Regions:
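Class I SAM-dependent methyltransferase SAM/SAH-binding core
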Residues: 32, 40-88
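Conserved class I S-adenosyl-L-methionine
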Residues: 129-151
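Short alpha-helix
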Residues: 145-160, 165
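Conserved Class I S-adenosyl-L-methionine
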Residues: 169-232
């Protein structure tokens, strides 16, 4: 992943959701980016809107990269990045105007559990951007742990939220992005196999797992970004 900056959610999609719903009114907004990765979303939001960003990730190398990008975009004074386990750290975080859950998977549980856990960290009028996906009607059996569209909406409602806007990811974009990512991964795997021939089987196993994941995303899942607010 060292070749990739945008390794999760699309900053452009998230910025459109913010603009479309008037969340960019006022530069004093406090934003919490959980699982911020290398800071692609955080840095862009700080640069475009002047938001105050708190990004958290468990990978030290990712946080170092995020700080580097913040310096490059001249928004270091607006961005604070932290190495921490979000499952633990979340308990002490309060009063954020916007929380971003950008493709973090089930680190905090399913969608309902995740939203329940972040709710206490929101301000009274705070919103959540959730970048996830749901299972399409047809798919292999190992996808049945993923919710379908209706089940996602049920989980959102049970957690005490409602949808302000839903952005469906375009399959051609997903395919293009996956091809780009797989190209980088393939290149690095070959380099690592040369450097560490005794671990060749581990790198090949990782590559195969990534290919399977890529196939699932392209053919059996619908990637979605939701803007959510508390239910009345």
């Amino acid at each position: 992943l060292q070749d990739l900056w945008e390794i999760g959610s699309s900053p452009d999609v998230i910025m459109d959701l913010i603009k479309n719903n008037g969340i960019n009114r006022g530069q004093d907004l406090k934003v919490l980016d959980l699982g911020c990765g290398k800071g692609a979303v955080s840095v862009r939001l700080a640069k475009v809107f002047g938001f105050h960003i708190h990004g958290i990730d468990g990978m030290p190398l990712f946080v170092t990269e995020a700080e580097k990008w913040a310096r490059k975009y001249k928004v270091s004074e607006l961005c604070r990045f932290e190495i921490a386990d979000i499952r633990i750290r979340l308990d002490t975080l309060k009063d954020y105007d916007l929380i971003i859950l950008g493709s973090i998977g089930q680190v905090l549980g399913n969608i309902e559990a995740t939203l329940r856990k972040v709710k206490d960290s929101l301000s009274s009028e705070g919103c959540v951007i959730l970048d996830e996906g749901y299972r399409l009607d047809e798919g292999p059996e190992n996808l049945y742990n993923y919710p379908d569209h209706l089940q996602v909406y049920e989980q959102i409602k049970k957690a005490g939220f409602e949808v302000m806007e839903e952005h469906l990811g375009k399959q051609e974009f997903i395919q293009h992005l996956n091809q780009q990512i797989m190209g980088f991964i393939q290149k690095r795997v070959e380099e690592l196999k040369t450097q560490f021939p005794d671990r060749k089987h581990l790198f090949e196993k990782y590559l195969e797992a990534q290919k399977i994941e890529s196939d699932i995303l392209e053919n059996y899942m619908q990637c979605v970004t939701w803007l959510l607010k508390r239910s009345v």
